[in-house]
Curated annotation (Swiss-Prot):
Chain positions found as S-(dipyrrolylmethanemethyl)cysteine: 253
Naturally occurring in which organism (per UniProt): Dictyostelium discoideum (Social amoeba)
InterPro entries given in the database record: HemC, Porphobilin_deaminase_cofac_BS, Porphobilin_deaminase_N, Porphobilinogen_deaminase_C, Porphobilinogen_deaminase_C_sf
Name listed for the protein in its UniProt record: Porphobilinogen deaminase
Organism superkingdom: Eukaryota
Its biological purpose: Tetrapolymerization of the monopyrrole PBG into the hydroxymethylbilane pre-uroporphyrinogen in several discrete steps.
Cofactor(s) the protein requires to work: dipyrromethane
């Protein structure tokens, strides 16, 4: 540690949205608590995913929609690290950058928020009428929910959380409800709006969902040293296993791939990691499932193994329609 050149100032990059700022401020506060002599500043910017709101995420492309601009700032030295929702970070990072920390994973579930004016706050997905319109910008959610609730229709809904709530409440948009990640609603203190928590048996979650990913320059030992205490081992094992799987599937962040990853016998010598995964086509009519369990320390290889099983079962054929676009 004595060989690391210390700095008295650290600059964190963040997207400008309220949720992104809450997440980044949490990281800033942890760093300052652990390193009281360091000044920590936040520099914000909009990413492509923030600016282009009239096109679905899957059609824009998948090369770091919510990360690229911040990555460029790291590479040119404008910022020292960047805070992202881990599910938005591509599995293949630009040369010169690395994932410095994965924070403790919080709620991984998705939630249904009903249009209370139309259906009442406590309406469930299964209770909605034929043809009800649900807002979601995630192909993963849409595919799994079409599989479970074929009577529903889905329409893209983009923007930050506050914008999406306004779109839901605007009758001219025709939404009967929308699907959002519980973790974001918790951070924004908006859980009172939740009508239903969608169980894993209906919809598996996104790779990395519920954790923050902190990206930094590869070889910046000082930044890595201040990030090390923020790494949550159990969450890191689960999320890195999922990212290893996604990397080999070559699916990207915006295709219908869902996971549920669990640790058993935590912190015991026989600790194991279990991954359940699903790959679907857009309407959920075709899907492939797989499950694997093994020693948790082999998280990276377990991710590769379940990816290979999915590939052997035909996942590439299902995903080819998305990867081409």
């Amino acid at each position: 540690m004595s060989s690391i050149t210390k700095r008295d100032k650290v600059i964190i990059g963040s997207r400008k949205s309220q949720l992104a700022m809450l997440q980044t401020e949490w990281v800033r506060d942890r760093i300052q608590e652990l390193n009281p002599g360091i000044i920590v500043e936040i520099k914000t910017m909009d990413t492509t995913g923030d600016k282009v709101l009239d096109v679905s995420l899957s059609k824009i492309g998948d090369k770091g929609l919510f990360t690229k601009e911040l990555e460029d700032m790291m590479l040119n030295g404008t910022i020292d690290l960047a805070v992202h929702s881990l599910k938005d970070i591509p599995t293949k990072l630009p040369d010169g950058l690395k994932l410095g920390a994965i924070t403790k994973r919080y709620n991984t579930s998705d939630a249904f928020i009903a249009n209370a004016k139309k259906h009442g706050k406590n309406c469930k997905l299964s209770e909605l009428p034929q043809g009800a319109m649900i807002g979601s910008s995630s192909l993963r959610r849409v595919a799994q929910l079409k599989k479970a609730y074929p009577h529903l229709q889905f329409k893209d809904i983009r923007g930050n959380l506050n914008t999406r709530f306004k779109k839901l409440e605007d009758d001219s948009n025709g939404y009967d409800g929308m699907i959002l990640a519980v973790a974001g609603l918790e951070r924004m203190e908006l859980t009172d709006h939740i009508s239903e928590i969608i169980p894993d048996s209906i919809s598996l979650y996104a790779v990395g969902q519920g954790s923050l990913g902190i990206e930094c320059k590869d070889g910046d030992d000082f930044i890595q040293s201040i990030l090390n205490p923020l790494i949550h081992r159990e969450s890191m094992y689960c999320c890195e296993a999922e990212r290893s799987m996604l990397r080999d599937l070559e699916g990207g962040c915006h295709v219908p791939i869902g996971v549920v990853t669990k640790l058993h016998n935590q912190s015991q010598p026989d600790e194991t990691l279990e991954i359940n995964a699903i790959v679907l086509n857009l309407d959920g009519s075709k899907y492939i499932e797989s499950k694997i369990i093994g020693p948790s320390i082999q998280y990276y290889q377990l991710g590769k193994s379940i990816a290979q099983d999915l590939i052997n079962k035909g996942s590439k054929d299902i995903l080819s329609e998305f990867i081409k676009k």
